[in-house]
């Protein structure tokens, strides 16, 4: 099972395309949609939904995959639910990059301090990070600097921020999922 978390643009047709691409790895791909506008509510909702889906599923190798803002959530929710994560161009600093787009961006900074202390050290090796060298929205180098000490970081030379095609990375994601 793969749980997919969309980014800020929850209505983008690219989400459906990514779900279809992920079905080449596992036919059981579940999109969990969330508001993107209310961080604390989103955290509680996603934690409850992902936990429920994982409990109901029978896949010991369940994986959570998030793009952009969904990558921010995939890392944290995956850690808290004990499943491996794939982050695609994760928005690690939404409090900086999304003021004016979300109601309370400062809640993201607060959430970051509420997660288990040093959670990345405890989560070491349990996340795969795909970063675009041509991300027109986020500073990929900053993300790599923060995440590379803990996770494998794979650079993509073609994609932009929305990372419309996961196809070149499906084999790597499949191998990462099978390690569970």
Swiss-Prot record:
The record ties this protein, via Gene3D superfamilies, to: alpha/beta hydrolase (3.40.50.1820)
**InterPro entries tied to this protein:** AB_hydrolase_fold, UPF0227, UPF0227/Esterase_YqiA
Coiled-coil stretches? none
Please, which domain of life does this record's source organism belong to? Bacteria
Q: According to the UniProt record, which cysteines are disulfide-bonded?
A: none
List the HAMAP family.
UPF0227
What family name appears in the similarity comment?
A: Belongs to the UPF0227 family.
- The name of this protein is UPF0227 protein NT01EI_1813
- UniProt source species: Edwardsiella ictaluri (strain 93-146)
Lineage of source species? Bacteria, Pseudomonadati, Pseudomonadota, Gammaproteobacteria, Enterobacterales
